[in-house]
Regions:
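A ubiquitous short alpha-helical element
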Residues: 55-63
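Short, charge-rich, low-complexity alpha-helical interaction segments
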Residues: 33-53
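Long, charge-rich, low-complexity intrinsically disordered regions
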Residues: 25-27
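Amphipathic protein-protein interaction modules
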Residues: 60-61, 68-109
């Protein structure tokens, strides 16, 4: 993965903000090999999408807007990219591993519900993710004017 750079037009500064992967395939490979964690997945999603807190159902769990936003982001991202259930679960990284290690547990209910019901159990009450508009324009060099 590479570091993402974000340019601030107001200050002219460039900030290193997030880990960014070249593609969804690269993100999946990094997560599945243990080189990326859940925070890396969320950072990748946040780098490419505007997030709107959205109510969603996942199996028997109702998630009000603003609660379980990480699960909302991951499931919406996976749905947008038509990922299969196993690839979707892998995006939960260490949290999915914790669920797999303790199948009878009560934690991480969104992961457990998705394991049980798959895409048939997921329903969003809106559109949680919207692709960010990327501006690639460089600042004008004042000396050349």
């Amino acid at each position: 993965f590479a570091l993402g750079l974000e340019y601030c037009a107001f200050s002219g500064l460039i900030f290193v903000e997030y880990a960014m992967f070249a593609s969804v395939s690269a993100l999946l490979a990094a997560v599945q090999s243990g080189k990326a964690n859940f925070d890396d997945v969320l950072n990748h999603i946040n780098a490419h999408y505007e997030f709107t807190p959205t109510t969603f159902n996942n199996g028997a769990v109702n998630n009000p807007a603003g609660q379980n936003s990480g699960s909302c982001r991951v499931l919406a991202f996976a749905q947008l990219h038509h990922l299969n259930p196993l690839d979707t679960l892998s995006l939960f990284a260490e949290h999915y591993k914790a669920v797999a290690a303790n199948p009878a547990g009560e934690d991480h209910q969104n992961i457990r519900q998705f394991k049980k019901y798959g895409w048939g159990g997921v329903q969003f009450k809106g559109q949680p993710l919207k692709t960010k508009v990327v501006v690639t324009e460089k600042p004008i060099d004042q000396k050349s004017i």
